[in-house]
């Protein structure tokens, strides 16, 4: 009888141990959180600039009166400030013949949720998405005129809490951009004077910011 009792206790202990091991494996930890929002593997020819876990390679941009910039749920979250809030790439970045893709989402606010400042040769320009009250898309600046006033300006409705895929392409004589596959910019840059507004100058050479708006960014990748 004692042998049967001992065997029974050993069996119960064995299954209890298995249960505890399984329970431990299910406990959340930082590396297993939010698996559904981790960056996808970059397509051939593309390099991921954001790992979905840290700001490695990035610095929070030194704007005046910014909100916070940090990684939340596998994305870079830019909290609303009293001006621009953003991140700037801190490593080498091409000046010409490259493409950038990313996904951006507006969380709250009424101005641009994604402003990409980028090099074009020795000049710089910014792609503004959702500016001037929310609908304006365009390049700032072209021949001294910002995105609301120059030939690249267009209007597009952006829903809050919705992801938009933004694709920027810079070549020797053209700047192009697409949002969710729809081309919104097709500018022949020959003979054009490209510049940026002074308030986004800290984003140089390559940075992404919002203006008095909370937004989030993910799957930032580069092709050159």
Could you say what each language-model-derived stretch is?
Residues 2-15:
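Bacterial N-terminal signal peptides that target proteins for export
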Residues 26-224:
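Carbohydrate-interacting regions of secretory-pathway proteins
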